[in-house]
């Protein structure tokens, strides 16, 4: 038995690569501080503006669940990509092998909890951008 509590003030935010003309996105990696052994989780912040976006990708074995904590997530799913707008409180579950790309088209910051299982030993396959 046991538990771990991670307070938002304790998040260690890292800025991820982005195109020079795009707003940056930031990640707080939670798997290690939470002690996850069989899952993977992050909190993402996408700045508002001209479309901060994640990398388009797909996983071989990992399924991912996204919970929108603030803002509106524009998730491009499948091949060809179909845009799904997900409001605050909404959830998107993505099965392994499904192409996806997360984007913030809104004027507000997007805050997103991303959870995946099982954790993959190799990186996701990076695809061409949907936007």
Language model features with spans:
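Tight coil/turn sites that cap or link beta-strands
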Residues: 49-51, 88-89, 95-97
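A short, N-terminal "cap"/entry segment at the start of jelly-roll beta-barrel domains
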Residues: 1-40, 47, 123-131
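Double-stranded beta-helix
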Residues: 3, 101-131
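A short beta-loop-beta micro-motif enriched in histidine and acidic residues
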Residues: 31-40, 51-65, 79-80
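Short, charged/polar surface micro-motifs in flexible loops or helix N-caps
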Residues: 36-37, 47-52, 72, 118-121
């Amino acid at each position: 038995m046991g538990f771990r509590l991670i307070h938002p003030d304790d998040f260690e935010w890292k800025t991820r690569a982005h195109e020079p003309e795009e707003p940056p996105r930031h990640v707080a990696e939670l798997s290690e501080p939470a002690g996850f052994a069989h899952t993977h989780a992050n909190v993402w912040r996408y700045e508002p503006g001209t479309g901060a976006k994640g990398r388009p990708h797909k996983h071989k074995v990992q399924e991912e669940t996204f919970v929108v904590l603030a803002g509106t997530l524009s998730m491009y799913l499948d091949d060809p990509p179909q845009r799904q707008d997900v409001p605050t409180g909404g959830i998107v579950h993505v099965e392994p092998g499904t192409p996806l790309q997360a984007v913030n088209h809104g004027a507000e910051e997007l805050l997103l909890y991303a959870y995946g299982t099982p954790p993959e030993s190799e990186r996701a396959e990076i695809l061409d951008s949907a936007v």
